[in-house]
């Protein structure tokens, strides 16, 4: 099989490749990573932990502003944990996480005049952020009510951004595996992804299977590149399969 992982598809899926290497002939990753930060300054760790646990609730606007300042996990390894903690905290503390609204904002944001009143009402009155577009409603559809959102609320807190995170040993095991991985390993990332921009550097040149492959840094596509760059992704994956 050919593995393709984006976002959690890489965080979870790459460790699946580690556990079942015989099932995969090649690997393709896009806008994802396999973070392993074992040398983060203890002051930063303490600051992030205190922020996570201080009991203050974040609004959507504050969280979105913090994420907009990120330069990507591969470009700012020391600053990323604090910025990403805003996302972790918002998701964990928001019982009715606005999944559909957030997805439409990241993929194809509605006009500002439609969005701004909703965000302001949410910030000052606590009203729910409901999806505006058919795309947003489609992403909201899998959740009949807020009780079904516990998974996506908890998952950001499982991203191992600190050396104290519980998945550290599994990440070490995964990197020990991929540092010896000789099967084709192709990276397809985007220049405008605020979350994982720069993470391709952790793979290219370190994973033996990346050598000699036509890795791509696509000019645009946001975080969910499969929404905007599906033709480029499909062509690159098809070419990799036919040539290897």
Regions found by a protein language model. Name each.
Residues 1-4, 8-217, 226:
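Flexible "cap/lid" subdomain of the alpha/beta-hydrolase fold that forms the substrate-access gate
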Residues 211-244:
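Catalytic active-site module of serine/aspartate enzymes centered on a nucleophile-bearing elbow/loop
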């Amino acid at each position: 099989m050919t593995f393709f992982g984006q976002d959690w598809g890489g965080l979870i899926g790459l460790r699946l490749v580690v556990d079942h290497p015989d099932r995969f002939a090649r690997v393709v990753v896009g806008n994802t990573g396999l973070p392993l930060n074992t040398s983060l300054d203890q002051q930063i760790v303490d600051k992030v932990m205190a922020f996570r646990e201080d009991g203050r609730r974040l609004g959507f606007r504050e969280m979105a502003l913090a994420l907009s300042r990120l330069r990507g996990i591969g470009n700012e390894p020391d600053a990323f944990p604090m910025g990403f903690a805003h996302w972790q905290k918002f998701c964990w503390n928001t019982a009715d996480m606005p999944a559909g609204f957030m997805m439409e904002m990241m993929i194809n944001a509605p006009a500002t005049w439609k969005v701004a009143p909703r965000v302001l009402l949410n910030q000052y009155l606590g009203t729910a952020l409901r999806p505006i577009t058919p795309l947003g409603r489609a992403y909201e559809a899998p959740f009949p009510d807020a009780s079904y959102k516990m998974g996506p609320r908890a998952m950001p807190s499982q991203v191992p951004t600190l050396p104290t995170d519980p998945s550290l040993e599994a990440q070490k095991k995964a990197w020990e595996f991929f540092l010896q991985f000789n099967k084709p390993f192709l990276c397809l990332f985007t220049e405008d992804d605020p979350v994982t921009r720069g993470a391709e550097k952790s793979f290219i040149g370190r994973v033996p299977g990346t050598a000699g492959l036509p890795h791509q840094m696509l000019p645009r596509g946001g975080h969910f590149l499969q929404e905007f760059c599906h033709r480029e992704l499909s062509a690159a994956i098809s070419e990799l399969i036919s040539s290897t």
